[in-house]
Amino acid sequence: FNFKIPRYYYKKSFFYFVTISISSFTVQYFLSKFILFENLNYEITRFLISGIVFLIAYNFHIKFSFAKNKKVGVAIYLDNTENIDDIFSKVEFYPDYIHVDFVDKTMNKNISEPNFDKFKEIKKKWPNHRIESHIMSKTPIRYIEIFSKYSEVIYFHIEIDEQIEKVKNLIENNNIKPGLVLHASKYYDNIEGLVKNYQEVLILCIEKPGESGQEFFEESADLIERINKLRIRDQFNLCVDGGLSEKNISKIECEKIVSASNVFRNSNPKKQIINLQKILNN
């Protein structure tokens, strides 16, 4: 009960918990019965084996049974408006992951020119952090090659001018997870049909892609609720991005959130990340 597991993961988490617990008990029993440490009596041997097996089983539980702790990522724009050194000095290694936002003029005509070299800077500052990228473009195919070099997940929008399956396949061919973006301002009839072949889904909760500091789109709550009621909900991770703060994240059921202005404009960005993590997992 010290681990906060979303309701739709109860069955899977319980299965992992029982499997790991039974396996660890079986291993412990046979090791204790047939193995004795030299110069140690039976009771001490059992105590040592029990401790070792417990630590191994506990780590497996963390990795599998209770792996669904909600995560907070910070958004970094792939342009020249932000300085990576400044961002790092504010948040250091406190974010759970790094979310890279990229938008071109097909989705926002007022956007500045991209700076793809920032990927190298990001990777240098956070070498062990997971990088998830969000391509906001109606023609994402031309960007997949460069994004695949640095990303573990590449999100793209459903409202594009290219074939969705082709984009998805190109991302997968680069051994990267494709993620589908749904915009909260749109209404989707068959959500399950749209997301059923994805392990990662992102809901964009602001009106204009690529602009930080916008208000949370209230209709987003309805879309999030519809997605969380899907019968296949445990098959994908849900990420919520845009306009998030302490006031609304407590009402959001998801695995990950993305924050930019709420963290960076705070007087203590590191503490704010911790606050968001606590609220999400409370």
Report the location of each language-model feature.
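Glycine-rich phosphate-binding active-site loops on the catalytic face of alpha/beta enzymes
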Residues: 158-162, 202-213, 254-273
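Hydrophobic faces of well-ordered beta-strands that scaffold small-molecule active sites
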Residues: 70-76, 98-100, 131-135, 152-156, ...
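Glycine/Thr-rich beta-alpha phosphate-binding loop at enzyme active sites
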Residues: 105-113, 192-232, 271-272, 278
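Catalytic cores of alpha/beta
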Residues: 84-91, 139-149, 185-197, 242-257
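Alpha-helix-loop-beta-strand connector modules within alpha/beta enzyme cores
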Residues: 112-133, 170, 174-179, 183, ...
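Interaction-mediating elements
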Residues: 1-68
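Conserved, mostly hydrophobic/aromatic
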Residues: 91, 101, 147, 201, ...
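N-terminal active-site wall of soluble small-molecule enzyme domains
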Residues: 99-170
